[in-house]
From Swiss-Prot:
ATP-binding among keywords: yes
Cell compartments where the protein resides: Cytoplasm
Organism the protein comes from: Streptococcus mutans serotype c (strain ATCC 700610 / UA159)
Active-site residues, as the UniProt record annotates them: 196
Residues engaged in binding Mg(2+) 2: 173
HAMAP family registered for this protein in UniProt: RibP_PPkinase_B
Protein name per UniProt: Ribose-phosphate pyrophosphokinase 1
Function: Involved in the biosynthesis of the central metabolite phospho-alpha-D-ribosyl-1-pyrophosphate (PRPP) via the transfer of pyrophosphoryl group from ATP to 1-hydroxyl of ribose-5-phosphate (Rib-5-P).
Pfam families associated with the record: Pribosyl_synth, Pribosyltran_N
Gene: prs1
Entry note: cofactor: Binds 2 Mg(2+) ions per subunit.
Pathway(s) this gene product operates in, as recorded in its UniProt entry: Metabolic intermediate biosynthesis; 5-phospho-alpha-D-ribose 1-diphosphate biosynthesis; 5-phospho-alpha-D-ribose 1-diphosphate from D-ribose 5-phosphate (route I): step 1/1
Amino acid sequence: MSYSNLKLFALSSNKELAEKVAKTIGISLGKSTVRQFSDGEIQVNIEESIRGNHVFILQSTSSPVNDNLMEILIMVDALKRASAETVSVVMPYYGYARQDRKARSREPITSKLVANMLAVAGVDRLLTVDLHAAQIQGFFDIPVDHLMGAPLIADYFVRRGMCGSDYVVVSPDHGGVTRARKLAQFLQTPIAIIDKRRNVNKMNTSEVMNIIGNVSGKTCILIDDMIDTAGTIAHAADALAEAGATAVYASCTHPVLSGSALDNIQNSAIEKLVVLDTIDLPEEKLIDKIEQISITDLISEAIIRIHEKRPLSPLFEFTTFN
């Protein structure tokens, strides 16, 4: 099928993924340049006509978070002024998602602010993967397509025979139970939950309190939406090992991996950490314990279905990628 009126542009954060998606769809990446003035000010130039086209921008708001967000906003403004028919943002990793509520007095709800900024800039639709808090979809007055990474993670483990009653899918906290239950459904395993208490006065840290469920003599598969400093996932893995788990694997959609993350992973009971490529990882972060799998097919199919006005519901099923 011809996609002559479909354009896909990459900015700075996910160029390799964007190239793979464009190739899978059967189109060329749109021609554009992003540069910074000496004071850090961002300028975007679109180097081809997009008048009347349906345009998709692929960019995660990963580090540097603020630069990547500004690139999106400026690019959207440029596309709108150049008479694009529609502008959709494909944001595999939605930054600022952890600031989705007021945990303490006088705190902002920055997730809502970012949603407002995208809408005011002129975004017609947002496509993202595994929001840290699903209710962020409700911050938008435009359509939000919220894809799941669990089918891809399930495919990884099923292909290695890691499914059934000898395995347990573990949520590292109560907030991730729905995600863990979905993966457990795909892998046909029971689930367990780590009961933890987070120290609100110290960022990126949490304390493991208790394990709800039987993990003794089982291979455990931890699943989370993101891993930042890896303190939570490393402590959870160690707690599972102490509780009698025979092996501990971990998985996440978004490998933020900042600060001491690599040391925490390397020194933990985790045998293998499976991550998606919603965030580009430099070679030095791809240590032996980390294996990255691609969301290329998921994003490509989603873009095609949006462009052709077909439902995205099949993308939520494990059989789509099996």
